[in-house]
Amino acid sequence: MLNIYLSGEIHTDWREEIINLCKNDNLNISFSSPITNHEASDNCGVEILGKEEKKFWKDSKGANINSIKTRKAIKDADIVIVKFGEKYKQWNAAFDAGFAAALNKSIIVIHNDEHQHALKEVDAAASAVAKDQYQVVRILKYILEGSLN
């Protein structure tokens, strides 16, 4: 069984697409991901540990709590898939890719051609750079089954 961490943008259903496509192909994969509820992710620190007057400390508390899950999941992953969306700059996704690279994890990056130049260093650390979820699932199927179908 492969353990895969799904990092990246949280504004589309790309994770569910990959999970469902892999299920349809009966691929033996376990998936994990960050907290994708944006409001909960942003506010967990102050909701759990108390309010902050300055936004920096609010964000710091939330990021620190969220990093507990992220670090564990990336360390446990065989492959880290990082999706960069079209609308927002996903700094945390780039950080996850760097952390995964530092741990010598296999990385698959997803982004459109428009972001190629901005992500060239991230792409250089990746084992594969895909344009969409379908290409990712084909990679996973090939890795697990040796099949190109």
For every predicted segment, state its role.
Residues M1-N149:
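Conserved catalytic or regulatory cores that recognize and/or transform ribose-phosphate-containing ligands
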